[in-house]
C-alpha cells in the first residue's frame, strides 16, 4: 500500500497487533508508528532477535503476554522474554487465572516498571450474555464454567472475565493494590494517548468506579462527572 492508502486504512485505529517475524513486518511497523498507531506484538512465533527488531521498529506494547506467542524457553527465548526485558514497552496480562498461572504474575511486576503493565479482559461476546455457545469471528466457541474454548480443537479462545474480577485476582495474588489499579486505569489511558482520563486530577474527566472493599464488586460508576450506575 502507498502511504495515502495505508493512512486511510488505519484511520481511527489506535492499536494493531502484528507478528514481527512476518515478511515486511518491521517496515510496516515503522509506517504504522509514523501514522500514530500503537503497534502491539503478538500472535507470534518470533525469536528473541525478531521480537527486538519489532520493538526497535516502533512497536510499543505486547498482546496478552505469554498467550499465543513464543515464550521463555532457556535455549530458544522468544517474544515473551523480549517483552519482559524491555523496560520501554507495555505488556498486557489476562488475569483470569486461566490464561496465565497466578504464580507468574508477581514475576511480571518484578521485571517490568509499574507503569508498563496493563490488565486486559480479552472478553468476547459470550461475556455476560448468558449463552453457553457462540461465535468468535468464524469460529464456534463454547463456555465451560469460566473457560471459553473452540468447539473444534479445544484451544482457549478469549475470555468471559471482567476487569473488576481481574483486579481482585491480582490483589489476592499479592500485587499491591495501587499497582493493580494503575494497570487497569492510568496505564491503558497513557498507552492510548488519552490524556484526559485514567487518573484523578483537577481538570481531567471524572471517571470513577467504586468497588466493594472485600469482594471488589462494582458498586457505583461515574462517567464524565455523572453517576451512571449506583448500587
Residue spans for each PLM region:
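Short glycine-rich loop/turn motifs that provide flexible caps or phosphate-binding loops at active sites
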Residues: 41, 57, 157, 192, ...
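C-terminal cap of metal-dependent C-N hydrolases
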Residues: 200-231
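Short, structured coil/loop segments at alpha-helix boundaries
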Residues: 25, 86, 101, 176, ...
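His/Asp/Glu-enriched, well-ordered alpha-helical/loop segment
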Residues: 78-93, 97, 109-211
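Active-site core of metal-dependent hydrolases
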Residues: 1-131, 150
Amino acid at each position: 500500500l502507498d502511504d495515502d492508502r495505508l493512512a486511510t486504512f488505519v484511520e481511527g485505529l489506535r492499536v494493531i497487533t502484528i507478528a514481527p517475524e512476518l515478511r515486511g513486518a518491521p517496515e510496516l511497523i515503522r509506517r504504522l508508528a509514523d501514522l500514530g498507531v500503537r503497534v502491539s506484538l503478538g500472535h507470534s512465533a518470533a525469536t528473541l532477535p525478531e521480537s527486538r527488531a519489532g520493538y526497535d521498529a516502533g512497536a510499543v506494547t505486547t498482546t496478552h503476554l505469554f498467550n499465543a506467542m513464543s515464550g521463555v524457553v532457556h535455549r530458544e527465548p522468544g517474544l515473551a522474554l523480549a517483552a519482559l526485558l524491555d523496560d520501554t514497552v507495555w505488556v498486557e496480562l489476562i488475569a483470569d487465572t486461566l490464561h496465565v498461572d497466578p504464580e507468574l504474575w508477581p514475576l511480571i511486576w518484578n521485571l517490568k516498571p509499574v507503569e508498563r503493565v496493563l490488565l486486559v479482559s480479552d472478553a468476547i461476546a459470550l461475556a455476560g450474555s448468558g449463552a453457553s455457545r457462540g461465535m468468535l469471528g468464524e469460529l464456534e466457541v463454547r463456555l465451560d464454567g469460566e473457560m471459553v474454548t473452540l468447539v473444534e480443537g479445544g484451544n482457549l479462545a478469549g475470555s468471559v472475565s471482567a476487569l473488576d474480577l481481574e483486579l481482585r485476582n491480582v490483589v489476592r495474588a499479592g500485587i499491591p493494590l495501587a499497582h493493580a489499579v494503575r494497570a487497569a486505569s492510568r496505564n491503558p489511558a497513557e498507552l492510548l494517548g488519552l490524556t484526559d482520563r485514567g487518573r484523578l486530577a483537577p481538570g481531567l474527566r471524572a471517571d470513577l468506579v467504586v468497588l466493594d472493599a472485600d469482594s471488589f464488586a462494582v458498586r457505583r460508576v461515574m462517567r464524565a462527572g455523572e453517576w451512571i450506575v449506583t448500587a
